[in-house]
Amino acid sequence: MAGGNERSIKALKEVWRRAENSFCADCGKPDPDWASSTLGVFICLSCSGIHRNIPSISKVKSLKMDHWDDAQVQFLANHGNAVTKATYEAHIPIYYYQPNYSDCQVLREQWIRAKYERKEFTELGKQLPYHDGVKEGILWKRGRDNGQFLPRKFLLSEREGCLKYFTKQDAKEPKINIKIDVINATFQPVKIGNPNGLQITYLKDNKTRNIFVYHESGK
Ligand SMILES: [Zn+2]
C-alpha cells in the first residue's frame, strides 16, 4: 500500500473484510483484491480487466497496491457488493444466465456491460424487448469451414416461433432465421467434444443443415 496513510488503510481493510465483499461482485470468485472506486464493488483481477474496458462507468484500483484516499474508502464503505448488487441486479430475468469465474471472458464481459453500462437490471421491464417469450444467449458454434468453435449470439423467439443466430454481436439481421417446427435438436456430447454439445438439424431449401453448438454451463 504505497503512499497510503495508516488510518485510511485500516478503514479500507475493515470494509474489504466484510463478508459481502469477500467474493467478486461479478463472478463470485473468492478473495477479490481489486475494487471499482466509481461503482463501489469489490472484484477479482480478471473482472477488473473487463471494468477497465468501460472507463466511463468504472475506475478500478488495486486494494493492495494503490492508494485509496479517505473519500474513496468512505464511498466503498457506503456501497460495497451488497448495496451495489441491490441496485444493479434488482430485476434479473429468471432465464438470464449469470456467469461465474469459470466462464469465459466473453460471457463475463457481456454480463458486466449489461449490468453496469446498459443498466438492464435496475428497473423492472427494462428487458422488455426480450420478455416477449424471447430467450437470448451466447452459444459456441462450430464454424463450417475450419471446425473452430466461436461464440455467437442466439435468439429463441416463442412469439415468432423461430431460432436466429447472429455472427456479429451488434448485427441487426440474423445470419439464419429458422422456424422452430422444422428444428430437431439432439444432445451430442461425444460428436462435439463437450458435455453440453447440441446438434441442431433443420431443413433449408429441401436440404438438411446441421449446426453444432455448445454452452459452457449446459443451461
Ligand atoms: Zn470476478
Predicted regions and their residues:
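Short, flexible, mixed-charge glycine/proline-rich loop motifs
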Residues: 11-20, 33-38
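Short cysteine-rich clusters marking metal-coordination/redox-active sites
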Residues: 24-27, 36, 44
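Cys/His-coordinated zinc-binding microdomains
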Residues: 28, 40, 48
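Canonical phosphoinositide-binding patch of PH/PH-like domains
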Residues: 206-218
